[in-house]
């Protein structure tokens, strides 16, 4: 049993090694196959390019093995890099100079400001009494001006109040005159109405008097006529009884 197991294990190991070898061989074959067409393609492209150039002579090379075109490109690139470095350095110097000039200007302005402030302070110290006197004078002048303006304002307010009072009085007077005119007009209208009423009353009394007189006159005529008729009747027949008539007086 132990021998069979060892044999089987050795066989399996041998088969594994053989598989690995076959795989490596196949891979190497594939690589060689894949490399061959690439080389063929390169050789073909080179031959094609040579054919396209029509047998033009190859570029010349310098002592370092570079072609002239590559050397020219390298030199051009170096010059451009050098120009860029020069330009960067120039810009840096310009900025540095601008910074220095600005610092100089700021320092100059600061010193000038300090100098001016110191001179002003010295001048103020020298003219302190004169300045105080001038300040007092201006204060007094301003006080007088303010007092004059205050008096003018008070006078203006007083005058405005007087004008307003006068306007109110004029308005009240005009209102009073208008009221008196209205009262007078009303009194006149009342008097006219009363006079007209009195005239109407007199006319009515006169008309009533005339009506009463007419009635009395008619009554007298009627009585007279009755008397005459009675006389005529009495004259015709004395046997008839005497008629008596009585009339009530109408108002």
Curated annotation (Swiss-Prot):
Look up the record and give one Gene Ontology term from the biological process aspect: RNA splicing
Q: Where in the cell is it found?
A: Nucleus; Nucleus speckle; Chromosome
Q: What happens when the gene is disrupted?
A: Morpholino-mediated knockdown produces embryos with heart edema and decreased brain size. Embryos have imparied movement without lethality up to day 9 post fertilization, after which they die due to an inability to feed.
Give all cystine bridges in this chain: none
Bias (Basic and acidic residues): 49-63, 71-92, 215-231
Look up keyword Nucleus and say if it applies. Answer: yes
Alphabetical UniProt keywords: Chromosome, mRNA processing, mRNA splicing, Nucleus, RNA-binding
- One cellular component term from this protein's GO annotations in UniProt: nuclear speck
Task: Please give the Gene Ontology molecular function terms for this protein.
Answer: pre-mRNA binding; transcription coactivator activity
Q: Which portions of the sequence form the region Necessary and sufficient for transcriptional regulation? A: 54-251
Pfam families attached to this UniProt entry = ARGLU
UniProt main location, coarse: nucleus
Task: State the family named in the UniProt similarity comment for this chain.
Answer: Belongs to the ARGLU1 family.
Q: What is known of its domains?
A: The N-terminal region can bind RNA; preferentially binds 5'-CGG[AG]GG-3' motifs.
Q: Tell me the function of this protein.
A: Dual function regulator of gene expression; regulator of transcription and modulator of alternative splicing. General coactivator of nuclear receptor-induced gene expression.
State what protein this is by name: Arginine and glutamate-rich protein 1-A
Which source organism does the UniProt entry give?
A: Danio rerio (Zebrafish)
The gene from which this protein is expressed is arglu1a
């Amino acid at each position: 049993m132990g021998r069979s197991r060892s044999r089987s294990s050795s066989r399996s190991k041998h088969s594994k090694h053989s598989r690995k070898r076959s795989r490596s061989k196949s891979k190497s074959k594939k690589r060689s196959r894949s490399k061959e067409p690439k080389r063929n393609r390169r050789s073909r492209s080179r031959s094609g390019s040579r054919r396209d150039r029509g047998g033009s002579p190859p570029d010349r090379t310098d002592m370092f093995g570079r072609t002239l075109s590559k050397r020219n490109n390298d030199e051009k690139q170096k010059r451009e890099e050098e120009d860029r470095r020069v330009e960067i350095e120039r810009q840096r110097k310009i900025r540095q100079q601008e910074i220095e000039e600005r610092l100089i200007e700021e320092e100059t302005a600061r010193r000038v400001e300090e100098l001016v402030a110191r001179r002003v302070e010295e001048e103020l110290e020298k003219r302190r009494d004169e300045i105080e006197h001038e300040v007092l004078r201006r204060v007094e002048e301003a006080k007088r001006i303010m007092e004059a303006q205050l008096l003018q304002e008070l006078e203006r307010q007083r005058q405005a109040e007087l004008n307003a009072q006068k306007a109110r009085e004029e308005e009240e007077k005009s209102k009073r005159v208008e009221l008196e005119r209205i009262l007078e007009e009303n009194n006149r209208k009342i008097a006219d109405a009363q006079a007209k009423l009195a005239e109407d009353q007199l006319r009515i009394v006169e008309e009533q008097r005339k009506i009463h007189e007419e009635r009395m006159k008619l009554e007298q005529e009627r009585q007279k006529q009755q008397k005459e008729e009675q006389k005529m009747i009495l004259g015709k027949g004395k046997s008839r009884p005497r008629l008596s008539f009585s009339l009530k007086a109408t108002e």
